Amino acid sequence: MKNRVLWCLLLLPATLMAQPARYPLTSIAGLRPINVVIETASLEGKKGLKVEASPESLASGAGGAEQLVLLEGLEFGDGVIEAEISGDIRPGAPEGARGFVGIAFRVQGDLRTYDAFYLRPTNGRADDQVRRNHSAQYISHPDWPWFRLRQEFPSKYESYVDLVPGTWTKVKIEVQGEQARLYVHGVKQPTLVVNDVKSGASARGAIALWIDKDTIAHFRNLTVTRRQ
């Protein structure tokens, strides 16, 4: 009996994680664009999904709606999200554009409420150290945009990571309750640790590719492993 109980305990961690759901992003099937234009395209010889803000979104100005690509039919609360992403500045973008690109999770039905990690690729090798320190960011819309987090909690939700615009970058997001961690470039230590995810410990929602309207983004090889 003792051996049986021990065996069940050993198996328990494995049963907590569902089988990974894989999205190569080499087609637009199963994707719902929100205020963006999507198409398959190659970057650095690798095929993926190209994402840009729609003309209507660009015309709406700085206070416009979110730019997302929703993964249809997938609900996520806790688990691991992995992908290769790339961000660069679109032609004609204003001077302050940084090529924001990332992944949103626990996206609610209003498409405005979510948590996200994103990168600012043009900050990664800037000559200004302050800009470098703002290379990776956590946000929680609509109540906690980056500028509010930076104003009220300087440096807590941002960090440095080496980035090059227009280049594939591996990212991994681990979410467990109110804790989330961002890993970049496949390293073992997280780039950014958040211990008070604003959506709360039990929130669930969709996953979406996330961009700023002044970004030309590419995504590929998205994998989602949900914790059951």
Predicted regions and their residues:
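Bacterial N-terminal signal peptides that target proteins for export
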Residues: M1-W7
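Hydrophobic h-region of N-terminal signal peptides that target proteins for export
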Residues: L10-A18
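Extracellular glycan-recognition regions
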Residues: Q19-Q228
